[in-house]
Amino acid sequence: MQTKNILDFEYSDLQSYLLNELGLEKFRTDQICDWIYKKRVFDFESMTNLSKDDRQKLSDNFKISIPHIVKKEVSKIDGTTKYLLELEDKNTVEAVIIYYPSRTIACISTQVGCPLKCSFCSTGQSGYVRNLSTGEIIGQLLAMEKDKEMDVKNVVYMGMGEPLLNFNNVVQTIEILNHPKMKKLGARHITISTAGIPQKIEEVGDLNKEFRLSVSLHAPTNLQRDQIMPINHKYPVEQVIQSCRIYQKKTKKRVTFEYILIKGFNDSKEDALKLVELFGDLKVMVNLIPVNENPAGFEKPSKRFIQAFLDTLVKNGIDAVVRAEKGSDISAACGQLRTRELKEANR
């Protein structure tokens, strides 16, 4: 009998299966979820408040498939921890634990590789293999939590891949993260990042959930964005912004935009003013990210240019910050996942 990964199941579907297919009482669902998501116990035999018969039924029908930690690197600068995780089919993904003074964040992947091939991002250079299953996405968080012996209260879908191209599985993982009997994370502590898939951004608005949306913009014009983000040929800047307006009208929530600053390319005061004009009356927050080491050889602007860009946005009524760099010494910063793996493979 082929067993199913229990991490693929939302609460209601799991309860229904346990009740109708295995004959387990309803309250057993809560006990099983507590063992997996709260206590991080990943074998049924250790679930001691279940009867031996129930444990056998679970083992016969389910597996708890957690990615194997192949490699772990810890930043000597800030403690950021990057994991190389192996899936059952031997494909690998990377995920990261990031520490801030007020919170700890798990950055998780949604695809093996990425099809978008943004020129400043290492993940896209490794090619695209497939979407991750619901259980494979959730499993990254559980593997890191067990290794760190801690509960992570903030999750960002900013690892490898484009989350909105794996829409159904990503939404299902959010239900699992948010459910009070499963991970019980507050929806506002969950952020989906996207390179800008207009139809899917609007669908996120239709969900009417409290999780946050972050859009990777990185340039104020199509001429610039075309050069660094091939997806812009299909979904130009204006279309992305319009979908964000529709999202905001539906949800009443502010949209966060990620903007990588590249020396001599998109870092001038004129670029900042074009950004202000592009946003118009859209309520936004802009995270400015000085570009990290990347396959295209792009360089960071000087601190003076970064500050001038920030000041121009703020003076024109745009909420903006320069995002603190984390994990750059272990290639765990924005756009760097899979960098070292690629370098080692090419030696």
Curated annotation (Swiss-Prot):
Name of the encoding gene? rlmN
Under the heading PANTHER family, the entry gives: 23S RRNA METHYLTRANSFERASE, RADICAL SAM CORE DOMAIN-CONTAINING PROTEIN
Where does the Radical SAM core domain start and stop, copy by copy? Answer: 100-319
Residue positions annotated to bind S-adenosyl-L-methionine are 161-162, 193, 216-218, 292
Q: List the disulfide bonds.
A: 107-334
Tell me what organism the protein belongs to: Petrotoga mobilis (strain DSM 10674 / SJ95)
Q: What is this protein called?
A: Probable dual-specificity RNA methyltransferase RlmN
Q: What InterPro entries does UniProt report for this protein, alphabetically?
A: Aldolase_TIM, Elp3/MiaA/NifB-like_rSAM, Methyltransferase_A, RlmN_N, RNA_MTrfase_RlmN, rRNA_lsu_MTrfase_RlmN/Cfr, rSAM
Under which EC number(s) is this enzyme classified?
Answer: 2.1.1.192
The UniProt entry's GO CC annotations, sorted and at most eight, read:
cytoplasm
**What GO molecular function annotation could you give as one example from this UniProt entry?**
tRNA binding
